[in-house]
Design a protein with these regions (language model features):
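Conserved N-terminal beta-strand and adjoining loop/helix that marks the start
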Residues: 1-21
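Residues in well-ordered beta-strands of folded domains
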Residues: 10, 37, 89
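Residue-level signal for short segments within beta-strands and strand-turn junctions
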Residues: 11-13, 25, 91-92
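Conserved Nudix-box catalytic region and its N-terminal flanking loop in Nudix hydrolases
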Residues: 18-57
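Unchanged
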Residues: 41-65, 72-125
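Charged phosphate-binding loop/patch that engages nucleotide di/tri-phosphates or the phosphate backbone
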Residues: 118-139
Length: 139
């Protein structure tokens, strides 16, 4: 059975000692739930290239994108297919302008705790946020 490779990119920013995380609400035709940036790896693309493309496409950020590999990935089964998802993070400058794609209806900057406890639908997404927060606390 074929495995679909995907990426998840958690966007964050620092303002003073505070970390906030970007979450996006998918449009109702795509489920209407909150999540980080996600997307599928296209033919001949690396995970890193996909992550960069998805950041450009989904939030309109084209400059100063430095991917952070947080060392977390997961697998899941959906719609009769296996999926492998590698998680990255990107730190944005506090004043970076966000322009969401038609895939989403709104975005919010929230604390990690709020993202995990109030907004994110899927456990694997929550775990990605937890891993990133742990990673950031170690550097």
């Amino acid at each position: 059975m074929k495995t679909n490779n995907q990426v998840e990119i958690i966007i964050f920013k620092r303002e003073g000692n505070e970390l906030t995380f970007l979450i996006l609400k998918r449009n109702p035709q795509k489920g209407g739930f909150w999540q980080p940036i996600t997307g599928g790896v296209e033919e001949k693309e690396t995970f890193e290239e996909t992550a960069m493309r998805e950041v450009r496409e989904e939030i309109g950020v084209i400059n100063d994108i430095k991917l952070i590999d947080i060392g977390y990935s997961f697998e899941f089964f959906d719609h009769g297919e296996n999926h492998f998802e590698k998680v990255f993070a990107v730190e944005l400058k506090p004043k970076t302008k966000i322009i969401i794609s038609e895939e989403h209806t709104e975005f919010k900057w929230v604390s990690g705790k709020a993202a995990i406890e109030q907004f994110l639908k899927y456990e694997n997404n929550k775990k990605g946020f937890e891993k990133l927060i742990d990673f950031l606390n170690q550097i």
